[in-house]
Structures are given as C-alpha cells and as structure tokens.
C-alpha cells in the first residue's frame, strides 16, 4: 500500500475551493456535508451554499460554519482526537440555533460509505477565511491535546490553495475578498459592534498518524475517558473523549506525506498569526453524585441479617440506580421496611403462619449489598497509589535534642546505641520516686522550660542517648493526652526513705539492690559503694548523707487501725523511726500514693505525733496533726431531748455500739458544763470529733457507780414532788423549741432524803466530759440531755433489773403523792380545786409489779409508764 493520499482526496479540496471562489456575489454558508462518495458530495455543494449579508448591507464571504469532507483511502490517515463542545456564548444568538451538529469525527478504523466526517472551524464575523493564499501556502490547524493554550502542531497539504487562520476573540481581524483565480486579496474591514459579532469558542481537531498496532490501544483509550458538558443543541452527540496519545504534525509533500513541523519556539512568528484563538479546554472533575460503590454481592433483602450502616449504604445506592434494576422500587421499599424493623426491633412473621406459601409466590428479593467501608470506583486507584507511596517513602526518625558534643562523642555513643533504643517498659517503683524525688513543677511548665533545664544540666544529658532516655521517660509519665486510669487494689505497698550516716558492707548493699533494675553501685573514694538511681546520681554524690529504702507492712484499704500488721522485729535497719513495739510512726491511716500523686511531705512530717520513739501505741486514741488533747475526744450529746416530749423506743440502740469509741480514762476531771441556746437538729446521739466552741457539754457529778437508786432515796412529800415537776415545767419551753436545756438536776442523797435542785455552773470548754451515766437512772427531763458513754457504764442484767424495779416503785409513789396533793383535774362540788384524796381514787392493783397497763386517767402517768417500759426492755 502507498502512503500517498488518494487522488480523489486532493481533487476534492481543489474543487471545493474553486466553487467557493466562483460564488463571490453570493457568499456561502456551509451547514452540513454528508457524503457517501466524492462525486455526490461535490455535486451537492451548490445546494448547501447560502448568502449571508452583514448588518451594514454589504455581502460578506465569511462563513459561520464550514465542514470539509475527507475521503479515506485504503490506509487510515487520521484518527479521532476529540469532539469539542461549543461555548455557552453561542446559544445567545438566534442564527446559531439552526446550525446542525458541530462535531468532528475522525476515526482510524474503516467506515462505511455513509459515514459523516465534519469539522467545525470557529471564527468571527469580521474575519476572513482566505488570506494571502499562495501556491506553497500551508493549512495551519492549531490544536492542544494537552489542554494548554499554546498551538503545538501544524498540518499542511502542499497542493491546496487555501490557508485557514483562526483568530482570537478580538475584533479588527483582517478580512479579504476571494478572486476568480482562487487568490484572495486583503481589503479593509469595518469594526462591528459587539452585539453583531459572534465568537465561536470551539476547538479544532487534532490529527495524528495511526498505526495498525495502535488501533486497539486507541479504541480502549476512548472507552476509558469520562464525558463532559456539551452544547445544548447536541445532547446526544456532544460527548467527547480526549485522547491520551501524543499528537504529531503532518505535512504533505511530493516525496513523503508525513513531515513533522518545527516546534513553536523554533518557527518564526507571523504577525498575522499572533491573534490566534487561545483555547482553554476545561476538564471538569468527577461529581460526587458520580461516585459509586462496588456492590460485591447480592443478598436477599427479606431474610438477610442487616446492619444499620449497610442498610443506609444499600438504600442510597438503590435510590440512585433503581432504574437499572428490575425490582428497583421493591428493593427501595424493602430497605425502608428493614430499617424500621432494625430500629424498633420488630419481629418478623413467617409466611407459614399466614398461609402465604403458594405456587406463584416468590419469597425472596435479591439486591445489591453495599458496605460503608467499601472503596468507591472514583477513589480506589488513588488510594492504591497513596498506599504505594507510603510504603516506598523512607521512615522519618524523630528528632532529638542535639548538643555540641554530639559529633565528638559519636564514636562513644555508637556502642551504646542498642541500649538507647531499648524501650523503658518498667514503671517507676515507689523506691525510685523516694530516691529521685518528685518533679514538683507541673507538666505544662516542664515543657515550657525544657530547653532551659537542658542547658543547665548539659553535663548530665551530654549526648543523644541521654536525651532520648529523658524524653522517653517524660513521655511515659506525662502523656500528651493525659487521661488518668486509676486502678485500686485491696492492699497498698508502703515504704519509707531513711537517712543514715554510714552504709553497711558491700555484700549486704549489693544483695539489697539486686531487684532494682535502674540502680547502680559505684565505688567512692573511701571504698564504700553508694546506692543511687541513675537520674539522681549528681544530687546523691553532692550530699554527705545516704538514703535507704525500708519496706513497711502492706496496708489494706478501708481497714481498722487495729488490724494492721506489726512490723518485723528482725528488720535490718530499724532506725529511729520505729518504736519499741515494732510499729512505725508512719501515719497509720491507709493511704494510696499513685505514680503522679506522690508527695514527699506526706511521707514524714515533723508536726505529726511520731517524734518520740518510746511512745506506745494506744488503740483507743486517734492521732491528729497536732498533739492529742481533750478536744479530740469523742462526745455524744442528746441535742434533741428525745426522751422528754416524744415516744421513743431505743430498744435496739444499745450503748455498747459506742463503747469502742468512748474514753475509758479513770482519772478525768468531772467538772460541770453548760449548753448554750443554740439549736441543732440531729440524731439523739451526735458524735463530734472536734465540737464547736459554742456547743457546751453536760455531765452528772454523781455516777450510778457510786450512788444506788433506792426507794428510800426519795421522799413522798408533796414538796419533793412539786420540786420535780416544777423543774419539768421550767424546762418545757426548751423541749418545745427542740433546744438543749440549760439546767441540770443532780441527785444527791441528804440526811432528810430530799432532792435538791441546783442549776449547772458553766465551765470552760477545755474541761473534761468523761462523766458517766447509766441508762437506768431516774427518768427526768435533765438526766438525758447530754451524756458521755464509756466502757465503765456497762451493767449486768441483774443490776439493770434491780435499778429498774427501784425506779418503778419510786415512780409509783411519786405519782400517788402528786395525785393526792396537786391533781389539777380534781374538783369539789363548788367547782374549786380540791386536795382531798378521796376525790381521786387510784387503783392499787393496776400498778402492781406484774401490771404493764398504763394509767389512762392522767397524761403524766402515761408518760412515765412509756419511759419505764422502754428502759425495761
């Protein structure tokens, strides 16, 4: 086969140009050209020519659209590059709407005779198609397949007498007239208004030689490209596929048909070519709506076990592409039903229960299953490229603090590089914290002054290894996003740092520090090995004393003080911090020191009570920050006077539950104290470890231990009865106001047996309040105001019963005497109060020892009976 073009192709171009020149009075407008053969296309040219008249009345030879047919011979000369769209500005003119499809379809494959080949040549109204045509003129067709503004290639046919110039979108381009001999002579052109000028922003075709081996590659390339927007008139044919193959220049000559043109930077620029049209081919990116997920499988929408995220992903895909599925609407509805079932946890009724299984029924509905984690088609290749780049990229090592001695010590640090790379996995023990001390500066300030600390301690961290260790140490103790996770244990390990003047022998110290991974033993000048932590080597070497760690017995959280284990007597270094009993004066309250919550002032404080090593441990004492005083004793007060105006039953509230907290000091002072008028609503027994100064205390001078309550101790006279109930009436306002009474009744045995009522004398708060009272004492209003309980108040069952019987008998006599002498409810016949004992008869049998029925005739008798009943139980 010959590489020269067919003769019919050359004649076609000549004949077309000659017919153009003959129709000077009637400028032509080429609309479309579809030719099954060359002769038919030439004969039909006259039918397609139309006259176009400018707005100023002159006829112009300009063309709005020109299509040149190219007949292909036996070999493929040209291949399709692009179908370029027409700009939006073309649609603003009415005369453009009638134009046919502006496209260029040139394919390297063989076509039938009915194929259409056309190209759109854009230009303006005031520009000429013909300009200075010569015999050796070329046909420059400037294209840019790489989507740039430069004109790269030039294609010429040497036997044509036509030159195509594409003008920029500016007015004033040269126009010319076409003569009969086929030559064009330039002529002046008037400026046309912008409204009368039409600019066609379309691109010219790109031609390149195509080999037989490249046809399949070109075809595959066309199928893989993405469509972009096209002209409104050409909805069906506007999609173009830019080729990825490089374009070349073609020139026809007598010897060789293909001749590459010179590059743009080597060719001299013609002044007539400078206003060439700069085409900007905009490549639009893929829209988010075009992103599709790859459905890997098909599942039954009616019986599949769905996840909520998969339901949303599948439903979104179905709503966009339901037209592509036969059951798209059913799949969409099934997605909604599945989502409602999953959200509200509904149950599914089997078809068998509804007799739904028939021959024509289909109980399945298959559709695409998509997951939210599936990669999309649009980004799948990009993710693969990023993964490859990450795998190929070298790993960047973190920068560490460099000093001036790094290069000098490079040879020395190379041997210990393996040790520096080893991560610090062991957490710092309490022993290390005690020896090295805690960084009292908060972590933000440490980061702020890290550079200053590094300069001041340059001798310690003099190389890269030390800096790495230090950074790793701080990063472990103080993470960037610190969220403390505290795990509590039943037992807490305790230890204490002890300062000693001299260390033991080398063998003992070496065996003592075998389990300390971070401790080092270094010989000193005196031959004594010093045991220190590596991070604290400088500080320990400067100090003259030495520190050792002593283990304390494990403390159990929330445990009583008596249950703590005693320290082993065979301790290696008991020191001055341990008492005779082996118990240390370390705070006995169980405390947990976390890694970041450790404070040295909590380990040993001078103001605590462990200065004297000969003090014995007293389990009945509670130690405070200061010396234990009488103010720190426990006080139990009856602030509400519960036994005066309420019906209380404290059978279950035995005083023995308070005995372990009571004070059993036998030699305490028994001074009298008074209460203020302050009101406190609390339980009958209020416990105060530090009573407020305004709350006084009360006590009884005579304890039931030293005085016996007998019936003979009380007199049946009316004066005695009146004195008792006068006190009762006096204290009644305080009872109603729920305030502690001011007065205290002392039961004293006198020669005549009369009870004397004396007010309490106020005393200082520092006085003792360890006086004791028995719950079996006489039930008066003031006896139970405030008491202090201790183990000495424990009574046996026989003693309590005897005291109770004596109190009952005494109460009966008191009530009888009161009813005989001062009964406010008894009156005589005249209506005046009567003191006659015959007016009120008291049944003696109702008040015997075995009777427990209260006397209902008087409220005072009921009160006494209920109080006695509660004490008796």
Swiss-Prot record:
Biased composition (Low complexity): 665-686, 758-773
Superkingdom: Eukaryota
Location within or outside the cell: Cytoplasm; Vacuole membrane
Bias (Basic and acidic residues) ranges: 211-225, 743-755
Principal location listed in the UniProt entry: cytoplasm
Swiss-Prot/TrEMBL keywords: Cytoplasm, Membrane, Vacuole
Biased composition (Basic residues): 376-385, 574-586
Annotated Polar residues bias: 698-740, 823-855
One Gene Ontology biological process: protein catabolic process in the vacuole
Gene Ontology molecular function, alphabetical: protein phosphatase regulator activity
Keyword Membrane included in the entry's annotation: yes
Annotated stretches, region: Disordered: 1-24, 175-251, 375-423, 506-540, 568-592, 662-773, 822-855
InterPro entries the record matches: AreA_GATA, Glucose_repression_reg
Keyword Cytoplasm appears in the UniProt entry: yes
PANTHER family attached to this UniProt entry: PROTEIN MTL1-RELATED
Protein name (record): Uncharacterized protein C227.15
Native species: Schizosaccharomyces pombe (strain 972 / ATCC 24843) (Fission yeast)
């Amino acid at each position: 086969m010959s590489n020269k073009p067919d003769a019919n192709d050359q004649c076609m171009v000549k004949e077309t140009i000659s017919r153009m020149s003959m129709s000077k009075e009637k400028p032509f407008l080429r609309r479309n050209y579809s030719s099954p053969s060359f002769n038919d296309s030439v004969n039909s040219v006259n039918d397609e020519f139309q006259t176009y008249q400018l707005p100023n009345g002159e006829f112009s030879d300009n063309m709005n659209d020109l299509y040149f047919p190219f007949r292909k011979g036996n070999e493929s000369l040209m291949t399709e590059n692009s179908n370029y769209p027409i700009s939006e500005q073309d649609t603003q003119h009415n005369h453009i709407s009638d134009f046919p499809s502006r496209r260029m379809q040139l394919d390297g494959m063989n076509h039938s005779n009915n194929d259409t080949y056309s190209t759109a040549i854009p230009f303006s109204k005031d520009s000429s198609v013909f300009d200075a045509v010569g015999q050796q003129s070329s046909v420059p067709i400037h294209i840019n397949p790489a989507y740039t503004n430069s004109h790269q290639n030039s294609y010429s046919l040497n036997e044509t007498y036509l030159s195509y110039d594409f003008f920029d979108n500016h007015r004033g381009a040269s126009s010319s007239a076409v003569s009969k001999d086929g030559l064009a002579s330039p002529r002046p052109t008037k400026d046309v208004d912008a409204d009368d000028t039409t600019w066609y922003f379309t691109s010219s075709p790109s031609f390149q030689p195509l080999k037989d081996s490249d046809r399949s590659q070109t075809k595959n390339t066309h199928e893989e490209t993405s469509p972009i927007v096209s002209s409104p008139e050409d909805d069906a044919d506007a999609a173009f596929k830019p080729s990825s193959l490089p374009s070349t220049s073609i020139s026809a000559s007598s010897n060789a048909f293909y001749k590459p043109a010179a590059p743009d930077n080597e060719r001299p620029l013609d002044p007539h070519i400078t206003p060439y049209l700069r085409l900007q081919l905009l490549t639009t990116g893929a829209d988010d709506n075009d992103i599709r997920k790859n459905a890997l499988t098909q599942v039954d929408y009616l019986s599949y076990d769905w996840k909520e995220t998969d339901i949303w992903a599948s439903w979104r895909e179905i709503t966009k592409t339901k037209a592509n599925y036969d059951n798209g609407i059913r799949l969409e509805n099934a997605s909604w039903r599945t989502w409602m079932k999953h959200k509200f946890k509904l149950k599914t009724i089997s078809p068998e229960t509804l007799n739904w299984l028939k021959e024509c029924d289909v109980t399945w509905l298959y559709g695409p299953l998509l997951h939210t984690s599936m990669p999309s088609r649009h980004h799948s290749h990009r993710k693969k490229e990023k993964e490859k780049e990450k795998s190929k990229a070298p790993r960047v090592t973190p920068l560490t603090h460099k000093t001036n001695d790094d290069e000098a010590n490079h040879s020395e640090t190379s041997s210990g590089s393996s040790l520096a790379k080893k991560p610090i996995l062991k957490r710092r023990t309490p022993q290390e914290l005690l020896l090295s001390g805690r960084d009292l500066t908060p972590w933000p300030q440490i980061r702020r002054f890290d550079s200053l600390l590094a300069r001041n301690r340059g001798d310690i961290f003099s190389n890269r290894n030390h800096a790495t260790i230090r950074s790793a140490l701080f990063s472990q103790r103080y993470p960037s996003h610190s969220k403390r996770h505290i795990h509590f244990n039943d037992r807490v390990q305790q230890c204490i740092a002890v300062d000693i003047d001299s260390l033991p022998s080398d063998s003992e110290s070496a065996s003592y520090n075998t389990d300390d991974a971070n401790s080092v033993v270094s010989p000193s000048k005196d031959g004594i090995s010093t045991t220190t932590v590596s991070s604290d080597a400088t500080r320990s070497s400067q100090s003259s004393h030495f520190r050792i760690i002593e283990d304390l017995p494990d403390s159990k959280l929330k445990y009583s003080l008596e249950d703590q284990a005693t320290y082993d007597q065979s301790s290696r270094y008991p020191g001055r911090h341990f008492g005779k009993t082996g118990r240390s004066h370390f705070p006995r309250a169980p405390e947990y020191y976390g890694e970041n919550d450790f404070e040295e002032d909590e380990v040993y404080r001078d103001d605590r009570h462990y200065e004297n090593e000969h003090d014995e441990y007293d389990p009945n004492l509670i130690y405070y920050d200061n010396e234990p005083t009488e103010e720190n004793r426990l006080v139990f007060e009856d602030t509400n006077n519960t036994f005066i105006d309420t019906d209380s039953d404290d059978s279950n509230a035995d005083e023995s539950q308070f005995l372990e907290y009571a004070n059993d000091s036998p030699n305490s002072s028994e001074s009298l104290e008074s209460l203020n008028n302050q009101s406190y609503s609390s339980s009958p027994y209020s416990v105060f470890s530090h009573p407020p100064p305004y709350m006084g205390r009360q006590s009884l001078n005579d304890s039931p231990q030293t005085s016996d309550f007998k019936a003979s101790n009380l007199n049946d006279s009316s004066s005695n009865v009146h004195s008792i109930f006068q006190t009762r009436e006096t204290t009644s306002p305080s009872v109603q106001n729920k305030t502690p009474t001011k007065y205290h009744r002392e039961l004293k045995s006198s020669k005549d047996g009369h009870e004397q009522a004396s007010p309490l004398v106020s005393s200082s708060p520092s006085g003792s309040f360890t006086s004791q009272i028995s719950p079996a004492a006489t039930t008066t209003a003031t006896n139970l105001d405030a008491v202090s309980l201790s183990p000495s108040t424990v009574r046996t069952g026989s003693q309590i019963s005897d005291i109770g019987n004596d109190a009952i008998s005494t109460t009966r006599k008191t009530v009888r005497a009161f009813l005989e002498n001062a009964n406010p409810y008894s009156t005589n016949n005249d209506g005046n109060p009567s003191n006659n004992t015959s007016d009120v008869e008291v049944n003696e049998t109702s008040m015997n020892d075995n009777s427990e029925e209260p006397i209902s005739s008087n409220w005072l008798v009921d009160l006494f009976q209920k109080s006695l009943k509660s004490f008796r139980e």
